[in-house]
Amino acid sequence: MIRALKANGTDQRVLNAMKKVPRHLFLPEDMQSFAYADTPLPIGYDQTISAPHMVAIMCDLLKITEGMTILEIGSGSGYNAAVMAELAGENGKVYTVERIPELVDLARNNLERAGYSNVTVVHDDGSCGLPEHAPYDRIAVTSVAPEVPPPLREQLSKNGIMVIPVGTQYQTLVVVKKDSKGNITHKAMGEVIFVPLIGKYGF
């Protein structure tokens, strides 16, 4: 898996972070034999764990550095949050929001078992963000929204970066940047396929 990602030009810091995260711990037992295949896999409740190449792409685009505060929308099984926690380091903080109670428990258990104490899993409507800990240096959204939710734009810090899939019939991965004056820019990075973001500002 790592060799393939390296061949695709993934940043070395991202590769190192992904090497450290035992992906099989974030999968159901009957899926663990496929843990290091470059494909999305079901984790229950009509949700998936993203393919490793997509995790790598999003982390590359986010440009996470040590000590950052990160918001993730869509915890799933906790894998993506673990990779970002590795990138943010022990002085960083990851908040990850999940709407499905069973996945909240799953992500918490997986992250605790894997030793990630700098990740907090919250049960809430992720399309509204998590205002109590804003602003965030980076925001990662792991489900597709019809448009960029206004609360997420507001909760992004100045000089912050958000990566989010956007679209209805067709989905595009979008990089949202906020400059030092608070101006917002959007850049489309290519077509993707994600599960829908359900919530007030989702579907």
Swiss-Prot record:
It comes from the Archaea. It catalyses: [protein]-L-isoaspartate + S-adenosyl-L-methionine = [protein]-L-isoaspartate alpha-methyl ester + S-adenosyl-L-homocysteine. It is found in: Cytoplasm. Gene3D superfamilies: Vaccinia Virus protein VP39. Its EC number is 2.1.1.77. InterPro entries: PCMT (IPR000682), SAM-dependent_MTases_sf (IPR029063). GO terms for cellular component: cytoplasm. The keyword Heme does not apply. The keyword Nucleotide-binding does not apply. Keywords: Cytoplasm, Methyltransferase, S-adenosyl-L-methionine, Transferase. The active site is at S50. One of its GO terms (biological process) is protein modification process. Pfam families: PCMT. Its main location: cytoplasm. One of its GO terms (molecular function) is protein-L-isoaspartate (D-aspartate) O-methyltransferase activity. It is an enzyme of class 2 (transferase). Catalyzes the methyl esterification of L-isoaspartyl residues in peptides and proteins that result from spontaneous decomposition of normal L-aspartyl and L-asparaginyl residues. It plays a role in the repair and/or degradation of damaged proteins. HAMAP family: PIMT. Belongs to the methyltransferase superfamily. L-isoaspartyl/D-aspartyl protein methyltransferase family. PANTHER family: PROTEIN-L-ISOASPARTATE O-METHYLTRANSFERASE, PROTEIN-L-ISOASPARTATE(D-ASPARTATE) O-METHYLTRANSFERASE. This is Protein-L-isoaspartate O-methyltransferase. It comes from Methanococcoides burtonii (strain DSM 6242 / NBRC 107633 / OCM 468 / ACE-M).
